[in-house]
């Protein structure tokens, strides 16, 4: 068994999401907007819903407009349940 599988089983199944940073004004915290797309059961129209979540950014490296990957984690504060894994694309 690989090392990644062992660590994932110890931590449990954690959701990894991708979104854009909309705020970085707090210390060690970023606000990421996540988009979810679902198809309506009857009319088959694609519905988009947006949700803003707070994520932990230890080094304060993410900026507004960056495309980031975040991972679900234990509650770090009242509102913070995600942590920054990587910056996929920096804002222009």
From Swiss-Prot:
GO molecular function: rRNA binding; structural constituent of ribosome
PROSITE patterns: RIBOSOMAL_S17
N-terminal signal peptide: none
UniProt superkingdom: Bacteria
SUPFAM superfamilies: Nucleic acid-binding proteins
Keyword rRNA-binding attached: yes
GO biological process per UniProt: translation
Keywords: Ribonucleoprotein, Ribosomal protein, RNA-binding, rRNA-binding
A Pfam cross-reference name: Ribosomal_S17
One GO cellular component, as annotated: cytosolic small ribosomal subunit
Function: One of the primary rRNA binding proteins, it binds specifically to the 5'-end of 16S ribosomal RNA.
UniProt family annotation: Belongs to the universal ribosomal protein uS17 family.
Quaternary structure annotation from Swiss-Prot or TrEMBL: Part of the 30S ribosomal subunit.
Record HAMAP family: Ribosomal_uS17_B (MF_01345_B)
Full protein name: Small ribosomal subunit protein uS17
Biological source species: Corynebacterium efficiens (strain DSM 44549 / YS-314 / AJ 12310 / JCM 11189 / NBRC 100395)
